């Protein structure tokens, strides 16, 4: 679709989790700014509902970080900050992100939609 092609053109990176030839999870990320900034965004993560709670999300986050680290190192730089946005009322996501090492950095009021606040979660690297 056009949205997928647009994402590829913007340098989105895709990582999938596969079990018995079935995709059970997906995470996407993209770099922001110049490579020297080491800034990248977790754009999307989704796990097949019947496979949740089995470490797949954590594994995808780990692979995302390794992939981004490799990508930045290929340019002579290193990762500094991974961030994401999530709806303020998505409590399950907040619990997950905090469990895998993200910190709630701030909340953006009416960020995408009126009356829908977004939380910004970040993970910093040395």
Tell me what each language-model feature is.
Residues 1-50, 61-63, 67-71, 124:
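Acetyl-CoA-dependent GNAT
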Residues 12, 116-120:
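Short hydrophobic/aromatic beta-strand or adjacent loop that forms the aromatic wall/cage
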